[in-house]
């Protein structure tokens, strides 16, 4: 504020956000600007944009509601896309619905992970109980770390990648893809029965044997390897 072209810049900025489909941001920014000392003409230019943005948000919410009502019959890809959209645009609106879905429906592990992420970001503090890859889980979403902050993501993946940077740099993207996929599928399960160093060695052994990737790793006992493979088979 104070710039001679402030009002024109504001209108241009808000219009740009609208055409980029950032409807929630448009609504929030105009709410802030309305309290400022701006020209009446600027205010009258912004209010219709806010109304249109609210209408777009309502349309999105209605569409999301319709899909959620038949969530179990929806294809996997559409479930994923819907949950990503809900995380981006509708936090807090469908908490109870999604909590009921994860507790009562048979879902792909990736879908379960995204529902948990939605509930965590929406600060859902009630217990959620569900079964994931043959394990009964009870969590309170607000107490969960995000997928990007689990021990697997912050410690296991970097150690595997660090070793591959030495032994086989060309295989890093393949390894990252596999490891990130496993991180999402397992969330929020922690592999407490296998310590971190053994888990890193097991992943390097897996990459070496199944994908012909050159990787040096510490020796792994047959018991640890069998336990690791049992987990991996559930993730496929």
Report the location of each language-model feature:
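Residue-level signature for tetratricopeptide repeat
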Residues: 16, 53, 84-85
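Inward-facing hydrophobic residues that define packing positions of alpha-helical scaffold repeats
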Residues: 1, 29-31, 86, 98-99
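Structural signature of alpha-solenoid helical repeat junctions
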Residues: 4-5, 78, 111
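Amphipathic alpha-helical scaffolding segments comprising HEAT/armadillo-like alpha-solenoid repeats
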Residues: 27, 61-69, 91-103, 125-131
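Charged, low-complexity intrinsically disordered regulatory/assembly segments
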Residues: 133-236
């Amino acid at each position: 504020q104070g710039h001679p072209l402030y009002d024109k810049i504001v209108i241009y900025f808000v219009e740009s956000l609208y055409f980029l489909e950032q409807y929630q941001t448009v609504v929030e920014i105009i709410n802030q600007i309305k309290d400022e000392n701006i020209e009446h003409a600027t205010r009258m230019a912004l209010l219709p944009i806010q109304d249109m943005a609210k209408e777009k948000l309502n349309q999105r919410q209605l569409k999301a509601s319709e899909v959620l009502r038949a969530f179990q019959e929806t294809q996997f890809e559409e479930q994923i896309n819907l949950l990503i959209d809900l995380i981006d645009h509708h936090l807090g609106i469908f908490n109870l619905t999604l909590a009921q879905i994860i507790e009562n429906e048979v879902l792909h592990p990736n879908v379960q992970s995204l529902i948990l992420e939605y509930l965590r970001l929406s600060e859902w503090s009630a217990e959620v109980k569900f079964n994931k890859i043959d394990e009964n889980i009870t969590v309170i979403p607000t107490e969960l770390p995000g997928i990007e902050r689990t021990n697997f993501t912050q410690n296991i993946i970097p150690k595997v990648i660090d070793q591959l940077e030495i032994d086989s740099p060309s295989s890093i993207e393949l390894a990252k893809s596999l490891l990130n996929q496993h991180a999402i599928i397992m969330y929020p399960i922690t592999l407490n029965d296998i310590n971190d160093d053994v888990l890193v060695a097991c992943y390097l052994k897996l990459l070496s044997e199944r994908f012909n990737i050159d990787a040096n790793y510490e020796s792994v006992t047959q018991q640890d390897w069998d336990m690791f493979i049992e987990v991996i088979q559930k993730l496929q």
